From Swiss-Prot:
Its main location: mitochondrion. It comes from Paradoxurus hermaphroditus (Asian palm civet). Disulfide bonds: none annotated. Belongs to the complex I subunit 2 family. The chain crosses the membrane at residues 3-23, 25-45, 59-79, 96-116, 122-142, 153-173, 178-198, 200-220, 237-257, 274-294, 325-345. GO terms for cellular component: mitochondrial inner membrane. This is NADH-ubiquinone oxidoreductase chain 2. Core subunit of the mitochondrial membrane respiratory chain NADH dehydrogenase (Complex I) which catalyzes electron transfer from NADH through the respiratory chain, using ubiquinone as an electron acceptor. Essential for the catalytic activity and assembly of complex I. Core subunit of respiratory chain NADH dehydrogenase (Complex I) which is composed of 45 different subunits. Interacts with TMEM242. GO terms for biological process: mitochondrial electron transport, NADH to ubiquinone; mitochondrial respiratory chain complex I assembly. Its EC number is 7.1.1.2. GO terms for molecular function: NADH dehydrogenase (ubiquinone) activity. It is a multi-pass membrane protein. It catalyses: a ubiquinone + NADH + 5 H(+)(in) = a ubiquinol + NAD(+) + 4 H(+)(out).
């Protein structure tokens, strides 16, 4: 893709998200979602091959269906209240339709099936945008309508997302699919706390975006897409391999890394609200995510997958990719836990 075209497309993607973030009018929000969706499809098809075309088509169909449901919810709400304002009280039917539409855009279970397939079919850079930037707009709308959301519906989708996000990643060998299932699980955690403390959901989102960005950037730096390729990079880029492993353990929520902060704070907040079963379930299902990350770490750092001798040594080429933002991102993705007391201002 030529640089001028890429700049125009990226500007449209950013503009669409910014319109959603700054608007208090339902029609403007919907237009922002449409701008964002139509601009991101060429980014997904950057590598023009059948897999990317299939992934882009799946993404378009899912997002178009979600947009249709969102517009239906907006119309029903307009008929009942006569208001276009987002922060107004919503009609229960409209609220349910909007929640389902936003869940489809986010990839919450049971509307999650497109996320692993689309992520696997596109390049690492496109996958990074899909699993980070594309989560901001739907979550911002959910944040704004959180007082009017049906809590039982959202908790049901959150429970399913955390369970499927952990269970689905267990038998995966493709790193993009592992990160996609991890994204589904993280969306489940965010949806759980949204009802009780929406500000904590934003904290979770920021930490999730930092960890996922760092991981994808290191995979791009390393040109790694499978667990087998990752297990053979120890002799090519030992420092980067060890950083990837730390980031993956942080994504799994292992203390004392940054990924433990949101899980700790969410479980603490749920316990304060006299919920015992939900945080227990979340803690147990978090072990599923941690297990497949630990397995990946073990395979890379402590042992080697079966392979021939000529596969074990890789050529080392000089890497020309710019990594200016990578060091601070890695530091924040792994070492934020001493700053946890500052989060008390959210309460």
């Amino acid at each position: 893709m030529k640089p001028p075209i890429l700049i125009i497309i990226m500007s449209t993607v950013i503009s669409g998200t910014m319109i959603v973030l700054t608007s208090s009018h339902w029609m403007l929000t919907w237009i922002g979602f449409e701008m964002n969706m139509l601009a991101v499809i060429p980014i997904l098809m950057k590598k023009f091959n059948p897999r990317a075309m299939e992934a882009s088509t799946k993404y378009f169909l899912m997002q178009a269906t979600a947009s249709m449901l969102l517009m239906m919810g907006i119309t029903i709400n307009l008929l009942h209240t006569g208001q276009w304002t987002i922060l107004n009280n919503l009609n229960p039917t409209a609220s349910t339709l909007m929640t389902i539409a936003l869940a489809m855009k986010l990839g919450l279970a049971p509307f999650h099936f497109w996320v692993p397939e689309v992520t696997q079919g596109i390049s690492l850079s496109s996958g990074m945008i899909l699993l980070t930037w594309q989560k901001i707009a739907p979550l911002s709308v959910l944040y704004q309508i959180s007082p009017n959301i049906n809590p039982k519906l959202l908790l049901l989708m959150a429970i399913l997302s955390v369970l499927i996000g952990g269970w689905g990643g267990l038998n995966q060998t493709q790193l993009r699919k592992i990160l996609a299932y991890s994204s589904i699980a993280h969306m489940g955690w965010m949806s759980t706390i949204l009802i009780y403390n929406p500000t904590m959901m934003l904290l979770n989102l920021i930490i999730y975006i930092m960890m996922t960005l760092s991981t994808f950037m290191l995979f791009m730096h390393n040109s790694t897409t499978t667990t087998l390729a990752l297990s053979q990079t120890w002799n090519k880029m030992p420092l980067i391999t060890s950083l990837i492993l730390m980031l993956m353990l942080s994504l799994g929520g292992l203390p004392p890394l940054s990924g433990f902060i949101p899980k700790w704070m969410i479980i603490q907040e749920l316990t304060k609200n006299e919920m015992i079963i939900m945080p227990t379930f979340l803690a147990i299902t978090a072990l599923l995510n941690l297990y497949f990350y630990m397995r990946l770490t073990y395979a890379t750092a402590l042992t080697m997958f079966p392979s021939t001798n000529n596969m074990k040594m890789k050529w080392q080429f000089e890497n020309t990719k710019k990594t200016m933002f990578l060091p601070p991102l890695i530091v924040m993705s792994t070492m934020l836990i001493p700053l946890t007391p500052i989060i008390s201002i959210l309460e």
